[in-house]
Amino acid sequence: MVFYKYSGSGNDFLITQSFKKKDFSNLAQQVCHRHEGFGADGLVVVLPSKDYDYEWDFYNSDGSKAGMCGNASRCVGLFAYQHAIAPKEHVFLAGKREISIRIEEPNIVESNLGNYQILDTIPNLRCKKFFTNNSVLENIPMFYLINTGVPHLVGFVKNKGLLNSLNTLELRALRHEFNANINIAFIENKETIFLQTYERGVEDFTLACGTGMAAVFIAARLFHNTPKKATLIPKSNEFLELSLKNDGIFYKGVARYIGMSVLGMGVFKNGCF
């Protein structure tokens, strides 16, 4: 079984093809493991589709399925073009979402995430029980729960340096309380936003999270009056341009091919697939 490794904004993914829908959860856990596998934030399985150029099944590194992953959408778009599965401009199905892809040479990929949904606005008081003494999060007056394909909790700090002082245990508690990824961000100016994301399914900070960047972008736009186009800078420092248009949220940034790996037959005998 052949896996192609791609990276987008600091997220890395293993991409493979299958002609049938199967449960790849165990396989995802093994191949995404950083020490015992090839190492990746997630596994993308590209499948044939009657109505679209292709569709995918996406798995987090812990084997859980997710309907959407923003940076993976750009990576799989580049993969599909480079492997003659789809043209430069195409549409694929991610769960129930139609994702449009546009590739600009040599490796700039734009994807349309589609629409978003504001699920809730959460005052600080509802979260205080999860904070430790002198918590960075204490001074965030309001959190925003936003669905950009998967749910994200977003809060803004007033000092960029605080992004490096976040408490993993606090974010993990919030992640389980709201069953969402946790994003803490700083608006440097109206068009530049820094963020850190604690991602469910990875259960730790990640170098980047596309849907998390989208949620932060929307929260900043709606509640902090930022413009319809901004640059988001995650932990990886690989920036992503986000824009809001009539038909949804658009990502635009670099995606790159890293390498290829081949999985031997031993994994099949061990019952991992």
Curated annotation (Swiss-Prot):
Binding site for substrate: N11, N60, G70, N71, N181, E199, R200, G210, T211
Sites annotated Could be important to modulate the pK values of the two catalytic cysteine residues: H152, E199
GO molecular function, one term: diaminopimelate epimerase activity
Pathway named in the protein's UniProt entry: Amino-acid biosynthesis; L-lysine biosynthesis via DAP pathway; DL-2,6-diaminopimelate from LL-2,6-diaminopimelate: step 1/1
Coiled coil: none
Pfam (any one): DAP_epimerase
Catalytic activity: (2S,6S)-2,6-diaminopimelate = meso-2,6-diaminopimelate
Active-site residue numbers: C69 (proton donor), C209 (proton acceptor)
Keywords: Amino-acid biosynthesis, Cytoplasm, Isomerase, Lysine biosynthesis
Class in the EC hierarchy, top level: isomerase
EC number: 5.1.1.7
GO annotation, cellular component aspect: cytosol
Gene Ontology biological process: lysine biosynthetic process via diaminopimelate
Subcellular localization: Cytoplasm
Primary location: cytoplasm
Subunit organization: Homodimer.
NCBIfam families, per the entry: DapF
Family: Belongs to the diaminopimelate epimerase family.
Function: Catalyzes the stereoinversion of LL-2,6-diaminopimelate (L,L-DAP) to meso-diaminopimelate (meso-DAP), a precursor of L-lysine and an essential component of the bacterial peptidoglycan.
The protein's name in its UniProt record: Diaminopimelate epimerase
Organism: Helicobacter pylori (strain J99 / ATCC 700824)
Lineage of source species: Bacteria, Pseudomonadati, Campylobacterota, Epsilonproteobacteria, Campylobacterales
